[in-house]
Swiss-Prot record:
This is tRNA uridine(34) hydroxylase. Keywords: Oxidoreductase, tRNA processing. PANTHER family: THIOSULFATE SULFURTRANSFERASE/RHODANESE-LIKE DOMAIN-CONTAINING PROTEIN 2, THIOSULFATE SULFURTRANSFERASE_RHODANESE-LIKE DOMAIN-CONTAINING PROTEIN 2. It catalyses: uridine(34) in tRNA + AH2 + O2 = 5-hydroxyuridine(34) in tRNA + A + H2O.
Length: 293
């Protein structure tokens, strides 16, 4: 039986002709039978693709041959092309949508003026030395099933909400404290940390490689607790059998890490449900009434 894998990677680097890169990436994925999502902009690439292991390896090798993408940090996980409904390769103003393409400055070394990168072991050293504030760089719902202990979780539905959230003043008291931003694979914090630095946060760090790299090293024996939300059919993954379940069913409060869409076709709001509540259309509905109904 063929072995399948999913890869996640990004690169912030000047791309002179994003449309040409889009055509090349699509042709490369089609050649190797891969599916997934790839975004390309003048500032780089953001990709998650899956397929047969040998095909994914060939794709990664070819992608790394492009000068701007020589040094991409490729994160591997279990999964396959079946975890993605199709192949999507698009050119966008941003490879991660903060709604601030004019604020981001990128050169051949990556994002200019971002937070200091920390390897997982360096994060532990920093935590031992200072009173660190963890700042979640993901959508708020992702933190319902997993986050760093005692992390600040901004009230954002999408990454586009972060600028208004930062400009609201509610985090100004943190501007003189050491802040470690983190996200799934590191890309959102590349942008978020630079936005925070520009807004006067004096000591900003970012977890290099994101939660994925941290989890690979420390599993569930470190500062992370819970499951990691992922944007494909898997919905979430765990780093070990010792993973703690911190999510709660929106209907009954039972422990769960499983997200489901509301059964109301006019709503479809994504919420946490335990297996029992998800099994019936009567309980697979928003507990407080559907906001879209």
């Amino acid at each position: 039986m063929a072995i399948h894998r999913i890869v996640l990677f990004y690169a912030f680097a000047p791309v002179a002709d994003p449309e040409s890169v889009r055509l090349w990436q699509r042709a490369l994925c089609e050649k190797h039978g891969l599916t997934g999502r790839i975004l390309i902009s003048r500032d780089g690439i953001n990709a998650t693709v899956g397929g047969e292991l040998s095909a994914v390896k060939q794709y990664v090798k070819a992608t790394k041959e492009y000068p701007a993408f020589n040094d991409i940090d490729v994160k591997w996980s279990e999964g396959s092309a079946a975890d993605f409904p199709r192949l999507s390769v698009k050119v966008r103003d941003e490879i991660v949508s903060f709604g601030a393409p004019g604020e981001l400055e990128v050169d051949q070394n990556g994002v200019v003026g971002g937070g200091t990168h920390l390897q997982p072991e360096e994060l532990h050293e920093l935590v031992a030395q200072k009173d660190v504030v963890f700042f979640d760089g993901r959508n708020a719902f992702e933190a319902q099933i997993g986050k760093f202990k005692n992390a600040v979780v901004p009230d954002v539905e999408t990454t586009r909400d972060f600028i208004a959230e930062l400009d609201s003043g509610k985090y100004d008291e943190l501007k003189d404290q050491p802040i470690v931003t983190y996200c799934t694979g590191g890309i959102r914090c590349e942008v978020l940390s630079s936005l925070m630095v520009k807004r006067g946060f004096k000591e900003v760090y970012q977890l290099d490689g994101g939660i994925v790299r941290y989890g690979e090293k420390y599993r569930d024996a470190g500062l992370w607790e819970g499951s990691l939300y992922v944007f494909d059919k898997r919905m979430h993954l765990e780093f070990s059998d010792e993973a703690k379940t911190i999510g709660e069913c929106s209907r009954c409060g039972a422990p769960t890490s499983d997200f489901h869409n509301c059964a109301n076709l006019a709503c479809r709001h994504l919420s946490l449900y335990c297996a029992e509540c998800a099994a019936s259309e009567d309980t697979l509905r928003c507990a407080g009434g559907c906001p879209a109904a």
